[in-house]
Design a protein with these regions (language model features):
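Extracellular glycan-modifying ectodomains
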Residues: 1-238
Length: 238
């Protein structure tokens, strides 16, 4: 019933412009960028900002790029060695701590056109970049979190591929996060009442590239609302 608030993470990202917050070749942020974007949401919910280094140690352990060191010793040509040693030492691309307990139940359409559900670790060992978080072309996902924010309710995240990269951070605060793929989840609106009740949803976050907002081909999950003109209560944060 309350009006929505539009949050723009750009001002927070600009504070960290010298960190590796954007992929160099893709229109998306890195896990580091997604971390700072998430802080804007958590601050709106009344939480103090998290410490990135403390979170990295929880997710990735204390591993600090030994694979890069090994590669720089193996390739001795000066130019190649310089390129390797200059690579970003972001642990997200190097090692993922298998002790991280977070996992998700992913629902997607298989090759036969049937809906299939599988349980997997939230961050994948065999993928890198945003694919390590997104995985297959899913419809929706239920992420088990740590719930350290002690919220009474949970969170529904309606997100594109960029938005889902915030999931490991949001699941720190909530016990469960229901993630709807804005590109694929055509049944979201018709099942919304059931989802809100079943998963005790307290907050709904819609996270999408502003360039795609309002384009029905990029918003399958919300298209019924667009057609009905049901998104007029959004107010912009000052």
């Amino acid at each position: 019933t309350d009006p929505s608030v539009v949050l723009n993470p750009l001002s927070e990202l600009e504070k960290h412009q010298y960190e590796y917050i954007y992929f160099r070749t893709r229109n998306s942020w890195t896990m580091c960028g997604a971390f700072y974007g998430t802080q804007v949401i958590l601050e709106e919910l009344g939480y103090d900002k998290e410490n990135l280094n403390a979170y990295r140690e929880y997710v990735f352990g204390v591993f600090d790029g030994n694979l890069l060191l090994e590669a720089s010793e193996k390739y001795t040509a000066d130019e190649i060695k310089k390129d390797i040693t200059d690579m970003e030492r972001d642990p997200f691309y190097i090692y993922i701590n298998g002790l991280n307990p977070n996992c998700e139940e992913l629902t997607f359409e298989n090759k036969e056109g049937q809906k299939q559900t599988l349980k997997r670790q939230m961050i994948q060992f065999n993928s890198s970049g945003n694919r390590a978080v997104i995985g297959t072309d899913y419809e929706h996902s239920i992420v088990e979190g740590r719930g350290k924010g002690q919220r009474k309710g949970n969170l529904l995240l309606i997100a594109d591929t960029r938005g889902k990269m915030m999931i490991s951070y949001l699941s720190e605060v909530f016990e469960k996060v229901y993630v709807s793929n804005i590109y694929e989840d055509a049944d979201l609106i018709q099942n919304l009442d059931e989802i809100l009740e079943k998963y005790n949803i307290e907050y709904i976050v819609w996270a999408q590239d502003v360039a795609e907002t309002g384009n029905m081909s990029h918003m399958m999950a919300l298209n019924p609302l667009l057609k009905e003109g049901g998104m007029s209560d959004v107010r912009t944060d000052p």
